[in-house]
Amino acid sequence: MKWIAKKRLQSVLGLSVVDGQLRVAHVARAKSAIAVVRSASAKLSLDLLHPEAELVGREIKNHLEAAGIRERNCVIALPPSWIMTQHAKLPELSAEDQASLLQIEAEKGFPVDPDELQIARSPHRSSESAYVTQLAVRRDQLTRLSTVLKAAGLKPE
């Protein structure tokens, strides 16, 4: 059986929205380096979580067109206000028990049910103990963001 290899992108659009300010940078491979092809910044009149995702997507698309940016493959930095964090000390436990402990910590530490969150974990050690940092974002926000990006004609990677 022959596997189809995913082609490496030669360029990508990076986006961030913080406090209603859209910032974009189109970057591309240039020999042995990465170069910024074009960048732009614009104030959004609509919030990313506006009920009509198509309108938000259209506004982003209009800003990209005005800046002369045609790249559609993108990555996006999540708005910092969407990210919840939690830091926990991990006792010596089996992997299964650690997963259960982190689930309990998430239930106690985050303001919503962990089933409504996308949680990423980053383990780290000090000389004395093991710790984990849990980062969480509401799934409904991620779904809305995906809908907005698709409405803007973008392809999140």
Task: Give the predicted meaning of each segment.
Residues 1-157:
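Hydrophobic/aromatic-enriched cytosolic interaction surfaces used to assemble or bind macromolecules
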